[in-house]
C-alpha cells in the first residue's frame, strides 16, 4: 500500500518542480527597441527609441517601404539630467517594458559627440542587456531626426540605418570596437556619419537616409567629419575602404578616368630619423577602370601605364593630405602611436616624449603600389 502511495505522490512532487513559468513575461508586455538616438542640449540628455509595431508588420500590402500605408514603427523620446533618467522617463510613458537586447544601432547626435561620448558608452556597456554588437553612428544634426525619417526601401528606419552602417566600412564599427579604441592607448575611435536627405525623382522628393562622412574622434570627443577624398583616404589608412573610387586627372589636360580599387591594403613602418618619427605608409591595391573620359587608350600600352601612374599620384596626394589633417586635429584613428610603440626601429628616447609632440612633427612617406588589372572591354573612348 505504501509503495502505491509513493508511486502516486512522487510524480506530483516532480510536477511542482517542473512548473517554471511563475515569473514569465509575455511578449505582448515587452517593447523591443531596435534603435536608439542620444542627443544633448545644454545640460540635458535626450534619448529617443524606435520600437517596431508588430501588428503592422507582414501580411499587408500598399504603402512605401513595405508598409501598409501607416507606420510600422513608433518613436518616443524623453530628456533628463542623465541618460538613465531619460530612459526612466521614457518607461513611464510606455505600457510595455523596454527591452534593449535586440537593439542593433545607436546614433549619437553631432552636438553630443563634440561634447564627449563617455556618458553614452558608460550606460551602453554597464547594463548586460545591451548588445556590444550594436552599430555606432554619428548623425548630422540631431540624432532623433534620423529615427523619425520615413525610409522607402525598408520597413522601418532602424533596418535602413543598419544596412548603411554595414556597407559604409569593410568591417562594421560595433560598440565593442569603438570602446576598444576609446579605452586602449595607441588609437582613437571613428564612426560613420549618417544624415537625412531628400530623393530627387523630378517631383516632390521623399525622405531618405545616407552615409555622409566619417567621424574622427580624439579620445571621446568628435573633432571633425571627413568627406569625399579625405574620407576615402582615411578609410584606406584604416584598411576599412570598401571598393573606393578615384577620379583621376590625366596629364596634359587630356581628360579624366574613374578607377575603382577592388582590393587595397595599407601597411605601416615606423622609424626614427634625426630624433623625429618617420612613418612610411605602403598602399597596395588592384583597380579597374570604370569610366574613361580621356583620349588615352585603356589597353596595355604606354597610355595605359600613364593612367596607372596618374592613379598612384592621386592616391599619394590624398593620403598625405589626410594624414596632415589628422595631425592638425591631434587625432589618431589609424593607430600611428600603437605602431610606433611596437616598432623595433624607434628608441626609448623617442617613446618617452609626449605623443602629441611626436605626432605633430611626424614625417609621412606614402608609397602607393597600385596596378590596374582591367581596362574594360572597350579600349578606345567613343567620344574621342
UniProtKB/Swiss-Prot annotation:
Protein's job: May be involved in spore germination.
* Pfam families associated with the record: Spore_GerAC (PF05504), Spore_GerAC_N (PF25198)
| Lipid-binding residues (covalent, N-palmitoyl cysteine) | 21
Kindly give the membrane topology term recorded for this protein: Lipid-anchor
Q: What is this protein called?
A: Putative spore germination protein YfkR
Native species: Bacillus subtilis (strain 168)
Compartment(s) = Cell membrane
Protein family per UniProt: Belongs to the GerABKC lipoprotein family.
Annotated Gene Ontology cellular component terms: plasma membrane
Supply the alphabetized keyword list.
Answer: Cell membrane, Germination, Lipoprotein, Membrane, Palmitate, Signal
Q: Could you read off the lineage of the organism from its UniProt record?
A: Bacteria, Bacillati, Bacillota, Bacilli, Bacillales
Amino acid at each position: 500500500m505504501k509503495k502505491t502511495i509513493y508511486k502516486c505522490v512522487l510524480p506530483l512532487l516532480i510536477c511542482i518542480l517542473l512548473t517554471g513559468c511563475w515569473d514569465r513575461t509575455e511578449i505582448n508586455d515587452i517593447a523591443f527597441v531596435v534603435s536608439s538616438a542620444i542627443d544633448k542640449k545644454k545640460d540635458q540628455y535626450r534619448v529617443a527609441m524606435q520600437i517596431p509595431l508588430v501588428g503592422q508588420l507582414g501580411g499587408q500590402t500598399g504603402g512605401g517601404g513595405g508598409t501598409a500605408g501607416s507606420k510600422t514603427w513608433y518613436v518616443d523620446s524623453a530628456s533628463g539630467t542623465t541618460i538613465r533618467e531619460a530612459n526612466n522617463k521614457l518607461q513611464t510613458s510606455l505600457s510595455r517594458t523596454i527591452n534593449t537586447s535586440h537593439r542593433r544601432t545607436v546614433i549619437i547626435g553631432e552636438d553630443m559627440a563634440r561634447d564627449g561620448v563617455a556618458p553614452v558608452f558608460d550606460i551602453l556597456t554597464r547594463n548586460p542587456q545591451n548588445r556590444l554588437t550594436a552599430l555606432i553612428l554619428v548623425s548630422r544634426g540631431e540624432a532623433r531626426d534620423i529615427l523619425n525619417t520615413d525610409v522607402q526601401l525598408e520597413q522601418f528606419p532602424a533596418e535602413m540605418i543598419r544596412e548603411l552602417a554595414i556597407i559604409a566600412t569593410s568591417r562594421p564599427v560595433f560598440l565593442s570596437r569603438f570602446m576598444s579604441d576609446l579605452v586602449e592607448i595607441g588609437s582613437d575611435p571613428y564612426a560613420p556619419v549618417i544624415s537625412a536627405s531628400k530623393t530627387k525623382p523630378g517631383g516632390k522628393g521623399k525622405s531618405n537616409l545616407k552615409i555622409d562622412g566619417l567621424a574622427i574622434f580624439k579620445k571621446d570627443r568628435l573633432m571633425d567629419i571627413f568627406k569625399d577624398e579625405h574620407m576615402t583616404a582615411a578609410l584606406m589608412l584604416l584598411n576599412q575602404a570598401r571598393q573606393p573610387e578615384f577620379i583621376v586627372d590625366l596629364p596634359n589636360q587630356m581628360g579624366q578616368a574613374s578607377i575603382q580599387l577592388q582590393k587595397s591594403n595599407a601597411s605601416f613602418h615606423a622609424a626614427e630619423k634625426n630624433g623625429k618619427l618617420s612613418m612610411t605608409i605602403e598602399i597596395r591595391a588592384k583597380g579597374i577602370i570604370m569610366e574613361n573620359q580621356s583620349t588615352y587608350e585603356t589597353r596595355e600600352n604606354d597610355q595605359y601605364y600613364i593612367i596607372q601612374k596618374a592613379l598612384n599620384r592621386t592616391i599619394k596626394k590624398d593620403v598625405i593630405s589626410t594624414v596632415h589633417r589628422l595631425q592638425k586635429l591631434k587625432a589618431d584613428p589609424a593607430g600611428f602611436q600603437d605602431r610606433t610603440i611596437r616598432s623595433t626601429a624607434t628608441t626609448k628616447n623617442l617613446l618617452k616624449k609626449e605623443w602629441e609632440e611626436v605626432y605633430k612633427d611626424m614625417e609621412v612617406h606614402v608609397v602607393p603600389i597600385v596596378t590596374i588589372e582591367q581596362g574594360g572591354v572597350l579600349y578606345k573612348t567613343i567620344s574621342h
